[in-house]
Amino acid sequence: MADIKSNWSLVNHLDCNGKGMLTALSGSGSEHHFEITNFTASETSGKTHAPWFLGLKNGQVILLDPETKEINLSDKMPSDAFPAYSYKDPNSNRIWFMNDGDKDSGNDTLNCGDKGSTVTIVEKGDENTLPKHIKTLCVGRGHHVTTFVAPCDTHPKLPKVAYVSNLLDGSICVVGNDPSDSDNYLHIIHTINLCDSEKENDGNTGIPNNAFPHGKQLSQATGKVYSLNNGYGLVDVIDPMTHEIEKRIPFKGFSNLLLSKCGKFIIGKGADRKSDHEHVLGRLAIMDATTYEIVNLMEIADFYPSAYRFNQTGEKLYVTSAATGKGVQKDNLNINTLFIYDTSNLPELNLIKSLAVGASDCGRRPIAFPNDENSKLVFVPNPTDGTLSMIDGDSDTVIDTIKIADSGGNEFNFSFWQNSIYGA
């Protein structure tokens, strides 16, 4: 069994048919003792623009007013609070919260009108100070993925910037992220146009386009940013020194991109819903980040790969199951399994175990790992059941199944405010 003597804590948000449920779990000791606290209020905020849930601080809920940008602490979270997803800047004490805009236009009409949606940057502060709203920045429309670029040992001249992709615009906003550069700090200094006119029916060369970027990471091995354009089935190789697209690599059929811990391999996940109207075919592919060759491809019947992340050492890859499609295809899906792969010798990818967990009859099932080298725990939510599976990362067995809600839900999120966990 894994050594779980170190302390751990989780903050979870589960959407139960429009009502948000917020719970905090903490535990320690070899007997995996844990405590659960429910922070959900029975009533809504009563506001036109519901507050944003940012995280927990000293046992209180951190809420951001989207109109005034004021941040306050509360004993409870209103049931209509918006659980904004976020990206932690690894080089500062700041978190970037994303707003995808409304479902139809992708615009944050409160802050940007019809000109895009937003990224909100918050300074966490210390134990004795309130978090501070730094800036709300209008970027492009639709879902965002943020990638932080900064100098590293292998590439010490890289600029300090953040790449924010915009799904519905087909672009990447380059945001200055160097506090010593006051002219460019937290300003959009460049916009990368991801349009490929050969992939557009009308010969479009501008923004918006049909690139639909989703999945983007910086490799410290190559010093390049790899951006997956779902609409085109391409991976763009971008030089962060110039913000220019150097190469476009075919990678069709994959919906997300993940880099190996060594930065030398690109792992794509996707699903084929067209070949067989009764069965979904899940796919995992490994591309060499320097030769751009697909060096491994795995296909799993009746499986939709939802979230995937490496453990702390990079020797295991955990892939969660979830639901997609409709009719017979959806009925045949395996939505109760966690797939665990040996990645200690990439590009080899060997299945260690398909582990039975609870159900996820929804499109996304995240995963979390304690940010502690002494802990080997893995946490996988089961949204449909309203439970959380605690997994021993050494033996890859379920230690416990924890009830976190009275009923099931359709969307689950971990909060990464506390830095106590990492994942997806």
PLM ranges: what are they?
Residues 1-424:
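Predominantly soluble domains enriched in secretory-pathway, periplasmic, or organellar proteins
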